[in-house]
């Protein structure tokens, strides 16, 4: 067994779980579904997780095409993705992570179909998760790693489905303090992952600048 598979699987799981953040989504989900029955909530959660998974899979497999089409370098995307993920992690560390701010009138507007937006996109499948999916797909050099990535994403959304379905009971068990502690811990993990992502993108660019500088000087002289 390849020794890199387990660390890669752990990276996929921790990063996607913190970015999807089903525990942090629970209070918002309960607010948006206030007055609905458990059956209605379950239907919304099922559709939201399916929509999120399909959306993420589109970016996983179409990431390379999008890079070529828009002329985006992998390293540049790593840097931008690192910044986005770091900002999300920082907000979570402050226990003030809000995937999407909703006013009362907006909640009523989305009540008919909140499973797609805002619950599915961007709460469960936001820019951070999309950036993370594309970057990790770039790092998947073997079919085994690609399989682990896809399987982990499927597992995360399966867990998200069960967590949100049981959100009423979990909120009572965790309480506000427990939810804040969990959010801060996941935020710290996310910030570390973001720094690694940023550095991995910045290193090749800085190396090119360092190599090209002597060449430019010799050309001028």
Annotate each predicted stretch with a short phrase.
Residues 8-58:
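Juxtamembrane transmembrane-helix termini in multi-pass membrane transport proteins
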Residues 84-105, 193-204:
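Transmembrane helix exit motif
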Residues 39-64, 140-172:
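A small-residue-rich subset of transmembrane alpha-helices
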Residues 1-18, 95, 102-120:
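Small-residue-enriched transmembrane helix starts and helix-helix packing motifs
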Residues 9-25, 75-83, 148-160:
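Structural signature of hydrophobic alpha-helical transmembrane segments
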Residues 37, 58-81, 160-204:
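Transmembrane-helix boundary and interhelical-loop signature of multi-pass inner-membrane proteins
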Residues 209-221:
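Single conserved hydrophobic/aromatic residue that forms the stacking wall/gate
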Residues 42-96:
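Membrane helix-loop-helix hairpins that form the core translocation module of multi-pass transporters
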